[in-house]
Amino acid sequence: MTAVRTIGIMTGNSLDGVDIVLTGFENGRITDLDGFSKPYPRSLTEKMLRLRARIREEGGRMERLVEDGFSLEAINEYTSLVAETVNTFLQRSGYCREDIAALGFHGQTCDHFPPSIAGGKPAYTVQVGNAGLLADLTGIPVIYDFRSDDIMAGGEGAPLAPVHNLHIAGDLRNKGVFPVAFCNAGNTGNISVITEDKDGENVVRGWDVGAFNH
């Protein structure tokens, strides 16, 4: 199998910076190769806080904000910072953009209203970010919107970390470390537990456990 390299991009609810990781996939193994972080300028943090508050006031209805110049300005400024982070990383690390198959772009969560708290009302999730602009500014294909399908299927849309932890667990299992549990300590802490079913296949469960890095 030809090695595939991708860059994952995360901006957490703390609104303090952009974190990226370069990950390699080869022969069924996943390896984190390098990473880079860039802090938010204070002005952008303030804009994103205002944007998040407005989206929550509208109950996630983005159509009410599409003609709002401030909202589009904030989203594009945020996306430009993400692109700058990727481009700076590539320049400093020596990796060519042609070596990167795709960017995984989570976007900035501004509201999250899953079934567990919706109380029978329509569930939704809102992550902002201009994927087309990011692709244009970096020259790399962008994969985005990771939570919506799960919400529409009745899931919680969170956490995302168990998917990555499942890959790591496969490598640990080969080394005799299994079953395994992971604690992911972000703005909201979450736990992943990887066990096996009766057929010996890996089974992953994950859930948020509460506020952590506030």
Describe each region flagged by the PLM:
Residues 1-214:
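Short acidic/glycine-rich loops and adjacent helix/strand connectors
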